[in-house]
Each structure stands twice: as structure tokens, then as C-alpha cells.
């Protein structure tokens, strides 16, 4: 049975890549709050300017702002009768409780666990195409076209590091994650709606583990 999912885990745990793999396989809407915010920043909207200031300081966007953005998207999907995967939300206990209050059905949380040293390595060497959002890694999954994305044959598009992937920013984000996000994990454990997955393997391997545990496929 296809059901709505939340992907939880520290920055660099593979939430986005794994969610994309599964959403493509099952034709589920992949909602990345990070991607929504990055688009707002790129377009220099009032929201984007506010978010940029927060992100550049290595902090998370306030709950009330994030909640309203997610709620708007969920209302759209409900009208379309579509299932979804939430990636990057909720991040705090308050967000988790807000989400539970606005959903008609119980949601399953998938926690991706990975050691801190591997997280720092993953993020420090991560590169992303600004156009198609393809993700590369300078050590483990480099682009076959060097510093350019493989998917744009006519117009060379340079892959780039995300602004919040500096080592200093990574350490700040991990500190905030440990302080704010872990209480939320206990919340889902208590509600018996948490599946824990070891995320040290490749994206395809991790996705297959999620599929086996969640969809019995």
C-alpha cells in the first residue's frame, strides 16, 4: 500500500536523494522544503531574502514560516488526491505536532542514520546542478564531464557547492539537529510510526531497504 512518508535524518544522511529515488519509482510527490526555500532565495522574493539571512547564519527557518509553506503545498496535493514524501520537514517537535494536526491519516516517518564523520565528508564534497538539481560527489560520484553537469549536452552547466555546505555551516547545522530534531524522533517512536534505516550505503541500496520495510516490495 502506498502511504504518505516523512524522511528524517541529519543533513547529509541522504534524505533528498533517497526520497527522489522512491518518489520516481512510485510516482509520489516529493516535497523538499529546502528546495522550495532555495528557489525563493534564487528568485530574491521577500521570503527568499528572509530565508537567505537565516540559512547563511547556519540556522533553520522558524517553525511558523515553514509550517505555512508546507500546509499550502499539502492542500494542493489533497485536491489532486496525491500521496507525498516530505523531505526536510518536520525538523522540530512543534512542526511534527502541527503536521499531525492537519493530516487526515497517520504518516510514517523514515529515519536515515549515518555517522557524523561520513556526513561531513558527504556534504563537503557534494556538488549540485543548479538547473536539473542532479547531485554529484567529487570522490564517490563525480560528473563524467568534470566540473559540468552530465545532463546538458548543448549548454555546459557548471555544478556547484551549496552555500550551506561549508564545514563551518555543516557543524552548526548538526548541532542544531541534535538539539531540535531528536526530540521529534522520540515523538514518532512513541506513536509507533518510525522506521529506522542505516544510510551508510549507496542511494540505491538505501532506497531498496526503505522499499522493503515500508512497501513490502
UniProtKB/Swiss-Prot annotation:
Pathway(s) this gene product operates in, as recorded in its UniProt entry: Purine metabolism; AMP biosynthesis via salvage pathway; AMP from ADP: step 1/1
Quaternary structure and interacting proteins, as annotated: Monomer.
Annotated InterPro entries: Adenyl_kin_sub, Adenylat/UMP-CMP_kin, Adenylat_kinase_CS, Adenylate_kinase_lid-dom, P-loop_NTPase
Keyword ATP-binding: yes
Residues bound to AMP: 33, 38, 59-61, 88-91, 95, 162, 173
HAMAP family associated with the record: Adenylate_kinase_Adk (MF_00235)
Subcellular location: Cytoplasm
Family the UniProt entry places it in: Belongs to the adenylate kinase family.
Gene name of this polypeptide: adk
Residues the record lists as binding ATP: 12-17, 126, 135-136, 201
Region (LID), start-end ranges: 125-165
PROSITE patterns named among the record's database cross-references: ADENYLATE_KINASE
Pfam families: ADK, ADK_lid
Entry note about domains: Consists of three domains, a large central CORE domain and two small peripheral domains, NMPbind and LID, which undergo movements during catalysis. The LID domain closes over the site of phosphoryl transfer upon ATP binding. Assembling and dissambling the active center during each catalytic cycle provides an effective means to prevent ATP hydrolysis.
GO molecular function: adenylate kinase activity; ATP binding
EC number: 2.7.4.3
Official protein name in the record: Adenylate kinase
Coarse class of the protein's main subcellular location: cytoplasm
Biological process terms in GO annotation: AMP salvage
Keyword Nucleotide-binding: yes
Reaction catalysis annotation: AMP + ATP = 2 ADP
Amino acid at each position: 500500500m502506498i502511504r504518505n512518508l516523512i524522511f528524517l535524518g541529519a543533513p547529509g544522511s541522504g534524505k533528498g536523494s533517497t526520497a527522489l529515488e522512491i518518489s520516481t519509482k512510485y510516482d509520489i510527490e516529493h516535497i523538499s522544503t529546502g528546495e522550495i526555500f532555495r528557489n525563493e532565495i534564487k528568485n530574491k522574493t521577500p521570503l527568499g531574502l528572509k530565508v537567505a539571512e537565516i540559512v547563511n547564519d547556519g540556522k533553520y527557518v522558524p517553525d511558523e514560516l515553514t509550517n505555512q509553506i508546507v500546509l499550502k503545498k499539502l492542500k494542493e496535493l489533497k485536491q489532486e488526491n496525491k500521496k507525498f514524501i516530505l523531505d526536510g520537514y518536520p525538523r522540530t517537535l512543534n512542526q511534527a505536532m502541527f503536521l499531525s494536526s492537519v493530516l487526515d491519516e497517520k504518516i510514517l516517518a523514515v529515519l536515515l542514520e549515518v555517522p557524523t564523520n561520513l556526513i561531513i565528508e558527504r556534504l563537503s564534497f557534494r556538488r549540485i546542478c543548479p538547473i536539473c538539481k542532479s547531485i554529484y560527489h567529487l570522490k564517490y560520484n563525480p560528473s563524467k564531464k568534470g566540473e559540468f553537469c552530465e545532463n546538458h549536452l548543448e549548454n555546459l552547466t557548471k555544478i556547484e557547492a551549496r552555500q550551506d555546505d561549508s564545514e563551518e555551516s555543516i557543524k552548526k547545522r548538526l548541532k542544531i539537529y541534535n538539539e531540535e530534531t531528536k526530540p521529534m524522533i522520540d515523538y514518532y517512536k512513541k506513536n509507533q510510526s518510525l522506521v529506522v534505516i542505516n544510510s551508510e550505503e549507496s542511494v540505491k541500496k538505501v532506497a531498496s531497504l526503505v522499499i522493503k520495510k515500508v512497501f513490502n516490495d
